[in-house]
Amino acid sequence: MHKDSKIYIAGHNGTLGRALLVALKESGFRNIILKDRKELDLVNQDMVQDFFAREKPEYVFLCAAKLDTLGLFTPADVIYQNSMLQANIIQSSYQNRVKKLIFYGSAWAYPQKAMNPIGEESLLSGKLDLKAVAYGLPKIIGTKMCEFYNRQYETNFITLYLANLYGETTEFDLQKAKVLPALLRKFHLAKLLRENKTNEILRDLKMNSLDQAQEYLQNFGVNENSVEIWGSGNTIREFIHAKDLADASIYVMQNIDFKDIASHNEPHLNVGSGEFLSIKELAFLIKDIVGFNGKVVFNDEKPDSTMDRMLDSSRLQNLGWKHKINLEQGIRIMYEWYLKA
C-alpha cells in the first residue's frame, strides 16, 4: 500500500475497525473510505456492487460482521447477514480488481475437539461446537471463498484467524459483552459499591436510584462483597488487543501475499498473542488491576464452557510479525480508557 492508496475499511465502527482506522492514519495513509450502515447496507448485493464500481477501492479490510454472543440469541440473523455481506464484498472485490483484501476468521470456526494450541490445518477436521455454528460457519465459507478465488481468479485475498479480541472500544454492556470486558466492568462496579461511590455507580449504569442499580447488578452476581462468575473458571483462553490485530493486519497487507502461504494445507494465518490463561487467572488479574478487595466466587452449578481456545500463531511469526501488547498491559490500557469514557 502507498500512502495515497484507496483503502476501504468495512466495519470501521467495530473494535477492530476503529483500531485499524487509527493505525492507518498514524502511519500516514490518508485516502480511506468509510461508510456506515445507513449509507451502505453490506447485506444488499446491489448496493455493494454499486459502491465498489463507483469507489474502486484498491485495498479492503473486511472487518464487518454481525455479532451476538456467537449467534446464540439470533442465529438466523447472524448466519444470514454474515454470509451475505462477506460474499458481497469478496465478489465485488474480485469484479473490481481490488489489489488485496483481508478477511477475518475466528478461533470459534475451528472444530470443537481441535487440539490446542490450534494450527491452521485443523480447519474442517471436525464438527464445530453447536453454540458456535451460526457465527463460525460463515467464517469458514469466507475463508474458502478467499482461497478459491485466489486459486481460480488469481486474486490476493488473505484470511486472518484471531483469538478473543479486546480493546478500548469493545462492548461493555453486561448482557452482551464478552468475558474480558464483562469481568472488567463487573469488578469496577463492585469496587464502586464497596467504596459507597453512589454517584459514579448511577452515572455508569445510567440509573436514578441505588436500589435500582443494586437490584440490576445482583442479576449479574455483583455486590459490594463479591463478584460471581459462572462455571469453574478452568477454561483456557487467549486474547489479542485490537491494536495488535490492527498492526498485524497492516503488516500482512504490506508484506505477505497469498503466494507466500499458498502451498500450506489451509492457507490462512492465525493471529494470537501466545498468552494462554484460565478464566480464573483472568478474573484475578482483572480484580487486581481494578483494585477490588472483595471475593471472587466461581459458581460451578451454572453453565460452563469446557472448550479451550488457543491458537498456534507460529506461521505468521515465522513470516515476521509478533504481538507487542501483553495482556496485563492491554487490560490496564482498556481500563484507563473505560474510566475516562
Place the predicted regions along the sequence by residue.
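Adenosine-cofactor binding site in Rossmann-like domains, unifying the SAM/SAH pocket
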Residues: 31-48
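Conserved Rossmann-fold NAD(P)-dependent oxidoreductase catalytic core, especially the SDR/UDP-sugar
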Residues: 3, 87-133, 158-160
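N-terminal Rossmann NAD(P)H-binding glycine-rich loop of SDR-like oxidoreductase domains
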Residues: 2-26
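Active-site Tyr-X1-5-Lys
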Residues: 130-163, 182-199
